[in-house]
Amino acid sequence: MDRRTRENPERTFDLVLKVKCHASENEDPEVLWKFPEDFGDQEVLQSVPKFCFPFDVERVSQNQVGQHFTFVLTDMESKQRFGFCRLTSGGRICLCILSYLPWFEVYYKLLNTLADYLAKELEEDLNETLKSLYNHPVPKANTPVNLSVHSCFITPDITGLPTIPESRNLTEYFVAVDVNNMLRLYASMLHERRIIITSSKLSTLTACLHGSAALLYPMYWQHIYIPVLPPHLLDYCCAPMPYLIGIHSSLIERVKNKSLEDVVVLNVDTNTLESPFNDLSSLPSDVVSALKNKLKKQSTATGDGVARAFLRAQAALFGSYRDALRYKPGEPITFCEESFVKHRSSVMKQFLETAVNLQLFKQFIDGRLAKLNAGRGFSDIFEEEITSGGFCGGSPRSYQQWVYTVKKGGALFNTAVTKATPAVRTAYKFAKSHARLGLKEVKSRLKHKDNEEEYGTCSGLVQYTPVYTLHNEKGENREKHKLSQTHLKRPHKSLDGTLYDDDDDDDDIERASKISSEDGEETRAYFYESDDSVEAQVKAPYSGEMDLLGEILDTLSTHSSDQGKLAPAKSLDFFRSMDDIDYKPTNKSNAPSENNLALLCASGDQGEWNLGQDDSALHGRQLPPSPRKRVSSGGLTESLFILKEESREKPLCADSVSGPTVVGKPAPTSGLRSQPAAPEASQTERGRAEVKQTPGQAPLQSEDLSVPGPGSRQSTFVPWEKAGKEDTKPSKDVGLLQEVVSLCHMSCDFQQDLNISEESRSGNQT
């Protein structure tokens, strides 16, 4: 019961009454009209009319008491139901709206509209307006609501701090009572005294009670709370328990005639406060002086300055409650009163020793603990004020630790995970790892879909969705690990394309895995990584690691660009349709040299460099639209080792692979095309120069490593095609590995010396 208002009321209001007061106080008020007409709670119908005239009706007129005021009824659940009233006809007629919503300004405005309808006898408009609001779902904060042409409002935000002049209650309270009496009343409320506030204006009286009680936030007055006391309940002032009661000045003489002991009385009309206690001196002097100086500033008079000044005082007094929160494995989070009090100064310690026994503080702590242990958590302006003001005596990270515990499912759930049996823990890790894989797959699909929308899709091509997985470096051998670490401390690429570092990620996990314990030490929370996730990652066809071979080719392309003018990486034929592509071989000499390299690169004949689609179009094979596949660093390293070992073990014959040669009259079906991989082709061939050993595929032999002649086009090895097709047409089944071998040889030549002379070319031909 940390708050007294109902969180989710069913309706905007429950009842509207028109009550008539008789001339004699001995006669009960009479209900003239009600809405809805079928309202059947007789107890409410009998009690509400008596609260509509909380003054001496025989002595006071409407001009003396004002128009608007509010009373409060408490239901069986200790929740407050507000009665918003407006006096008319000289104080003899009262309109009352009963609601669980503390919308003071909204209902005061609605009462004025209803009074106008009654004065003009517009009963149809009156019923239509009430019916529209009664059937309207409870709107959220700051939502405009239109009831009729002349009636509309914006729902207030009751969770925020009250502001001046928007809050009528706080405005009237701040204007009617000076700063010193506000501080004395505040201190008396913190000590839970018996408090009476009196005034001749009902509107000012009820505003002072509601305004003073609101300044206790985030705590709430937990005892008897009657903003305005009707004549038949004056004996409540003799109750031995704490109370906060408002009494009209016409009835205060009757109250003083009763035996009152230890009662604090605030007279708003004379701005005087009578108290047998000196509660203000028991508060820490630094807190009181800071609050007093803040309230006296002119800038505090508007906005939320007054409410925030009291909020800061509350944070200074009670903000260290976070340091007294205790957590033991297997038990809910608890609050240690001894720890809350013992480390304070003498004045603060004396006050807190009294404060821990206050009902408003106990309800506040119980509400916080209930939210923490239920896993809901809390984040309000009070917690923000504690953090910003540094009123928590412990580590600044302590509150984040509790929030982290809540996010992990509450203290009880966290205990269940850490104290679970190995079987339960393994199941938890398995579910967690597969949930991560599923999330990564969804992100990769969304990313691939965005790429398709951005670059378009090629008709007739098979689309694929790469599955990005985390790479397990522990299972690699030492040689692969060295090759993958060619670029030291290479940041990995995340699923959304951003770069991150493993060390930073580990630090974040370590920082997030701290929770506080009873003795103030910090223990680590458990972050489980499933062993099953590693197996799932190995089976993934593609990986999100960097393409090292592609970067090597990029480097070679950059070096070769200095030797001559280069054309764009992709020709315009890349965007041509499949029917427009011509694959007729040319009969010119393609031997690369220093003289004709620039001509080859800048040649207008794009048939030589249209490697983006020619292979798939030539054989009718459907390849992925992306020119560059992503492979894992482990698989790529393995391919490079295979290429190096096979190239060293067995020299390649002239029919297989040779260096660049000069061909005078190239035959259409034999010979070797000696055209090097120019920089234009390196961009498109980069994604194709990758090898993937699929299950069931025969080991590659050096005899199969051949490059196509000038009469045939280089084809890309498709791993999902059956091996039976290789025996039918050898000219069409040249694998991707052939291109890799040729690229490696030619890349070495480019890297050693791009100035290819005539002597080296004749030596290679021999």
From Swiss-Prot:
Changing residue 482 to A: Impaired interaction with the AP-2 complex and impaired TCR down-modulation and recycling in TH2 cells. GO terms for molecular function: guanyl-nucleotide exchange factor activity; small GTPase binding. Residues 298-375 form the dDENN domain. It comes from the Eukaryota. Residues 160-296 form the cDENN domain. GO terms for cellular component: clathrin-coated vesicle; cytosol; nuclear speck. SMART domains: dDENN (SM00801), DENN (SM00799), uDENN (SM00800). Keywords: Cytoplasm, Cytoplasmic vesicle, Guanine-nucleotide releasing factor, Phosphoprotein, Protein transport, Transport. One of its GO terms (biological process) is endocytic recycling. Phosphorylated on serine and/or threonine, possibly regulating the guanine nucleotide exchange factor (GEF) activity. Residues 694-704 have a biased composition (Polar residues). InterPro entries: cDENN_dom, dDENN_dom, DENN_C, DENND1A/B/C, Tripartite_DENN, uDENN_dom. Residues 472-523, 611-634, 652-732 are annotated as: Disordered. A motif (FXDXF motif) lies at residues 378-382. Residues 480-492 have a biased composition (Basic residues). The modification Phosphotyrosine is found at residue 500. Residues 722-732 have a biased composition (Basic and acidic residues). The modification Phosphoserine is found at residues 516-517, 530, 533, 632-633. It is found in: Cytoplasm, Cytosol; Cytoplasmic vesicle, Clathrin-coated vesicle. Guanine nucleotide exchange factor (GEF) for RAB35 that acts as a regulator of T-cell receptor (TCR) internalization in TH2 cells. Acts by promoting the exchange of GDP to GTP, converting inactive GDP-bound RAB35 into its active GTP-bound form. Plays a role in clathrin-mediated endocytosis. Controls cytokine production in TH2 lymphocytes by controlling the rate of TCR internalization and routing to endosomes: acts by mediating clathrin-mediated endocytosis of TCR via its interaction with the adapter protein complex 2 (AP-2) and GEF activity. The FXDXF motif mediates interaction the AP-2 complex. This is DENN domain-containing protein 1B. It comes from Mus musculus (Mouse).
